[in-house]
Swiss-Prot record:
Cofactor(s) the protein needs: Fe(2+)
Gene Ontology molecular functions: oxidoreductase activity, acting on paired donors, with oxidation of a pair of donors resulting in the reduction of molecular oxygen to two molecules of water
Catalytic activity: decanoyl-[ACP] + 4 reduced [2Fe-2S]-[ferredoxin] + 2 O2 + 4 H(+) = dec-9-ynoyl-[ACP] + 4 oxidized [2Fe-2S]-[ferredoxin] + 4 H2O; decanoyl-[ACP] + 2 reduced [2Fe-2S]-[ferredoxin] + O2 + 2 H(+) = dec-9-enoyl-[ACP] + 2 oxidized [2Fe-2S]-[ferredoxin] + 2 H2O; dec-9-enoyl-[ACP] + 2 reduced [2Fe-2S]-[ferredoxin] + O2 + 2 H(+) = dec-9-ynoyl-[ACP] + 2 oxidized [2Fe-2S]-[ferredoxin] + 2 H2O
Function (record text): Desaturase/acetylenase likely involved in the biosynthesis of a polyyne metabolite. Efficiently catalyzes two sequential oxygen-dependent dehydrogenation reactions, the conversion of decanoic acid loaded onto the acyl carrier protein TtuC (decanoyl-TtuC) to 9-decenoyl-TtuC and the conversion of 9-decenoyl-TtuC to the alkyne-bearing product 9-decynoyl-TtuC. Shows stringent substrate specificity toward C(10) fatty acyl substrates.
Protein name: Decanoyl-[acyl-carrier protein] acetylenase
Compartments (UniProt record): Membrane
Native source species: Teredinibacter turnerae (strain ATCC 39867 / T7901)
Protein's UniProt keywords contain Lipid metabolism: yes
Gene: ttuB
Disulfide bridge positions per record: none
Record lineage: Bacteria, Pseudomonadati, Pseudomonadota, Gammaproteobacteria, Cellvibrionales
Segments carrying motif Histidine box-3: 286-290
Amino acid sequence: MSNTFDNALAQPQTGMDLEGVSTVAPRKKSRKNARVTLNDPGVQATQKVIAYLTIIVPLLGLVAALYLAYQNGISQLDIALLVGMYLLTNLGIEMGYHRLFAHRTFKTFGFVHYLLMVFGQMAGEGGVIYWVATHRRHHIHSDTALDPHSPHTCHTGAEPEELNLRRGLLHAHLGWMVNDKVTNSALFTEDLTRDPLTKAINDLYFPILILGLIIPAAIGGIVTNSWYGALTGFLWGGLVRMFFVTHSTWLNGSFAHRYGSKPFETGDHSANNFWCAIPTFGASWQNNHHAFPLSAMLGLKWWQIDIAWYFIWVFEKLGLAWSVRRLTPEHIERKRKVA
């Protein structure tokens, strides 16, 4: 493992500020909008094209898959491919992109580190550097005009504006990806860009994304020995899976910043949304998360389902994860709202 990789993961293990965003992210709100977002027409146009493809193509795949299922039924293999690829890519997002790369809540071996990165890129939510930069920006400017996907306010035009319920949910779920306010990744991801292999994997986003579509198609074709099996594997394990993974992630910025309980003082509108916990692998405990961004565990009650945490816990027991950041009762009580 390279020294660059070791330095990128370096983080203090004593006196942990579990209320910060990341041990490596900017800690103060940037004051100039031009510094937070890019004013590059070429980058903005490219981002819009990618965003529209990310939204529309999986939706078309879902429609095609449902039509074929109506005509011919759906096989157990297709269901297995959907579930299996959903598990791998959503773990890549929630365990990898989110808790490991964005917030550095645990450490792991280089092989696991980069494998989670690859699985995350197969999900179809952008390269790891773009995703982490956008997420750290969201935490630093949560539910303000500089938050990229707040359902309460936005800065997509000349001036910031407050959003009503319908516009807010639409903006936070999908609309934020197709405006001109592209996050300045260099401001938020110095730790990632210092590692050459991370940069190389990030630059291979589209080949890795396509690989995530080819794998279920190949499995479907080989197991059934038919082109139809390859097609349905591509649809259910590829595009349909991508549709559900991306929309589950987007729920965290839209519904989980509008609906749910708010036991902690966070200074924003983040809420704990029970109904989204399973598809998001625990990310929808947004109020918990915004209160303690550096905690590896988001589900703080026994009934708060947190699938990504269960995997981190198992990895720790197997010796595959260490320096796992945990909350103390004092951390929790200090942030709890006074009734």
